[in-house]
Structure formats: C-alpha cells, structure tokens
Amino acid sequence: MEQEEYLESAENRLEYVVDDIINKSSADDRMVALLEVLTETEVVPDVGRYYTFVYQPKTPRIKYDQNPLIACVSVDRWGFRGLNYHWGKFRNYTWNEIVGNLHVIYPLELRDARSIPFQHFLINT
C-alpha cells in the first residue's frame, strides 16, 4: 500500500470493538485482543506509519514497554526508531528483539488504539 493511500484510508477496525478490548482484565489480554483485530502485518515498518508489536529486549536491567504503540520515524540496518505513545518519547527497537511481526494501525485507528491501556512496562532481568 502506498503512503498516500495509507494516510487517506477510512478504515477503522477498532471502532466497534474498542470498549470490549478495554474491558479485558489485563494489559496482555488487551494486547491479544488488539492483535486479533489488527491482522495486517509487516516485517519492516514504513516511516510515517503506526504500529504495535510485542517487544522483548536483551539488555539486562532496562525498563521497557512489552506492547509498544509507535509512530515509525526512521528505519536502519539495526532496527528502527519510533515515538512510543505509551512513553511519550522516542525509543529504538532492534530487529532481533521484536517477537513476531509489526501490526499496522491506520491513522483513523490511532485515537482508539491510544485509548486502550495495553502498555506493559517491565524491567528486563
């Protein structure tokens, strides 16, 4: 899908399920429910697009968001950089630490995705 088509997409897969997802009992349950709806995936992100994915860093004693919601701002050989909406700041994500694929979030879905408390902050041991 071209960037212009992505940005102009009227698709919102979350509109009618967001309340059901929010009412799940844990962040991980909300993430699973979210990924069941966001079935379109990519391996490499496109700059300017929104994604969520499961992240498991290798660096010990680092605080991280296991379920980031990001806007991709750059892609490199080592991974990519994104604005993590749960942190409110830019974070780096390396290829080997991403579990599975990146789940695409369309622009009209971002507001609903941000309303779902699926962030899961952990300290890597």
Language-model features, listed with the residues they occupy:
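Short, charged beta-turn/beta-strand-edge "cap" motif at the junction between a beta-strand
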Residues: 56-62
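Basic/aromatic-rich interaction segments and small domains that mediate binding to polyanionic partners
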Residues: 63-93
